[in-house]
Amino acid sequence: MKRQLFLAGISLILGGMPMLAQDISPVNSVSYEWKSVPIVGGGFVDGIVFHPEAPGVRYCRTDMGGAYRWDAASNQWTPLLDWISLDESNLQGVESIAIDPQNPQNVYIACGTYTSSSNGAILCSYDGGRTFARIDVPFTMGGNENGRGNGERMMVDPQNGNIIYMGTRLHGLWRSMDKGQSWARVVSFPDVSEKFNPADRAAWGNRGSGIVCIVYDVQGTQDGRGTRDIYVAASLMGRENLFVSHDYGESWQPVEGQPVQYRPTHMVLTGDGQLVLTYGDTPGPSQMEDGGVWKYDIRKDKWTDISPVRLSDGGKAGFGYAAVSVDARNPKHLIASTHSLGGKHGYKSDEMFRTTDGGKSWKPIFKTGYEYDYSKAPYTEVAPLHWMFDIEIDPADAEHAMFTTGFGGWETFNLSAVERGEPVKWSIMSAGIEETVPLELYAPEKGARLISGIGDYGGFTHFDLNRPDSLGSHANPHFGNTNGVTGAWLKQDLIVRVGTLFGHQPGAKTISYSEDGGRHWTMCATVPTEKSRNGHIAVAADGSSWIWTPDRSEAYLTRDKGASWQSCRGLPKNIRIIADKVNPQRFYAVDAVAEILYSSEDGGATFHADTLNLTVKRFQRGNAGAAVRRGDPRGGQDRIYATPGHEKDLWIAAYDGSVSYTHLTLPTICSV
């Protein structure tokens, strides 16, 4: 896709320079081709939806990174929601996806990241996800809240594609009779809301996951009205959580004899009339302490506990179950995944179990033996297996199965190998999915094309922008978040990064550097204080001095690669500092709230303040009128840029684009 990038609304700070209005010429438009830099995955893929009849038609959803359609021609996923603007970013969290079983071209995406935000929208496509009609709905969604791996909450009636049901978290059951164009609440559906104390932060993530699963039983319904028998599960515990309608959704009643000691997480209906549900004592992905797998024979009205791991004493299991899937061609073949099992009952990690006799016996897939191919996303080799909140058996190929994780997902094409005692082979299925959270980017002039600081997975060094980092995420140490990464502009091989540690790494420091362009890393010997982490890092043009402003801290200077530190004088706390790309003695920082430009001419030891006549509109984060957050790791207008090859040449971005084009206040600042 070709897009136009215009250099408008960008302000040039001219420290100590004369008026240059006459030197500023109009900037012509430049054509750019935009594409993702592949990391592959990097975020929670919390749901996969296969079309039941059309081979190769499948979609996946993420908690806050949009939705994707599988493209068999390119053998990767295609993003569907990259067109959503910053102002509409709440729609990037996907609550559910539904495909019309009678028409694979009709797909519906329920969007909304947080129930505390504005109402959500349902995006309706009738051309396989190539275009969408946006339908605003009068209820909120929680694509990034607890229970986001449950599902599916939205389903198209398999016998009447005009009818769609949508289960919400806080607003009950809704129905569309016109392919998603309008929605009405099903007032006869029972109240499944939960009460919680808004002041209790521990309860925030579970203030109500609401309706989590919808299943249609098509047996015996062939009158054109749609499906008569519909099952709906709600994330409730200690009260009835599974309901059925036998009159096309007009009335509802709880299914008798159901287990109420857990919350449903997933539900499938087998071809021989068994409703199979996984349960946990939380919706997940929060920790589970109990759960089970149960099946309900809808013809005999009989419940059976078919949990793969059962305790003889009847106590809490210490873990729960996340998801279940059934072979479309053999109703006795199912797989089920656990949550919070690792380190318990002889299992090193969470497990996926397979049964070929309808749940009478199960075999553990990972414990029996497995092989992983990490080549498509090398960083996953050190990422632990977790959050298997959707598992799917391909309806067109029973050997092909997938499971999701917090960094993407895996797939196999020899699922039945476990029955023969052979390894099940897994490879990354996330090609094309890019859900990482970039916190900082650095592009050296030579060597690596890009060095990134990433949320959750540390960071990467890309020597080829078309391939994942073959070295995996940065090591020594592994960071969870890398909030700062930069280098010495006149000494290109020197790179420094700061962040927060991933997991338990005794003795590890939260600052590390590379002297070979990001290939290998060395931990600094010390940090300024015991609490120093994250924040921002600046490196002198020749690498002789580094300045680190840890999170919520004053700035510190080192001239010996972190062996010792001293406080910088003349700066407020938590301010972002950058280095001049020509003069190694010069550093700068901006306080956009107070409109002050700080500069140092002694290698960062001391800073002096000058008034900054900042006329451009500033980014307001939070409530209307709130001041920009100084030191914001994701941007804000305290981020300034130094120009390579030009001493004292600094740039700052205007949040309103070309609106600030007319502003011109010299000699301190020019708007271009």
What are these regions (language model features)?
Residues 38-65:
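Beta-strand-rich domains and repeat architectures in extracellular enzymes and scaffolds
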Residues 42-43, 84-88, 139-142, 190-193, ...:
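Short coil/turn segments at the loop-to-beta-strand junctions that recur within blades
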Residues 44-47, 91-96, 148-153, 200-215, ...:
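Signature of short aromatic-glycine-proline-rich micro-motifs recurring in repeat-based ectodomains
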Residues 52-54, 101-103, 158-160, 218-226, ...:
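Residue-level detector of Asp-centered blade-edge/turn motifs that repeat once per structural unit
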Residues 65-66, 113-117, 171-172, 236-239, ...:
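Short glycine/acidic-enriched loop and turn motifs that connect beta-strands
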Residues 66-68, 120-124, 172-175, 241-244, ...:
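A short loop-to-beta-strand structural motif that recurs across blades of beta-propeller domains
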Residues 83-87, 137-145, 188-205, 307-315, ...:
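Surface-exposed loop and turn segments in beta-propeller and other repeat-based domains
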Residues 662-668:
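Conserved small/polar residues in nucleotide/adenosyl-binding loops
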